[in-house]
């Protein structure tokens, strides 16, 4: 019953987010995450990078102002965040519009705020095509 209720909750979150977006142009869509005992609403526009932590079911969410560690998979985060985000390697997703520079020779991107992320060969080819 646990997995089913989580799936239903996620779908409801998406439905409510779509309703919010369509009813008010000035409301920025948010993603709701749980970090320990806290429930946090993060504006999606503020999320720069989401990085998986090796050998754990945790991810670090880097926003324009803070880092939040939550128990979640990268795949689920990408699903929640939508098409503005993309994988740059198997353990990291970024918000595409916040990529400030791509270094094709050394395979990394510099994000808004100066955060540097590694880009895999495969993802580099996709990113360069999209830019």
What are these regions (language model features)?
Residues 7-112, 116-118:
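Conserved binding/recognition cores within well-folded domains
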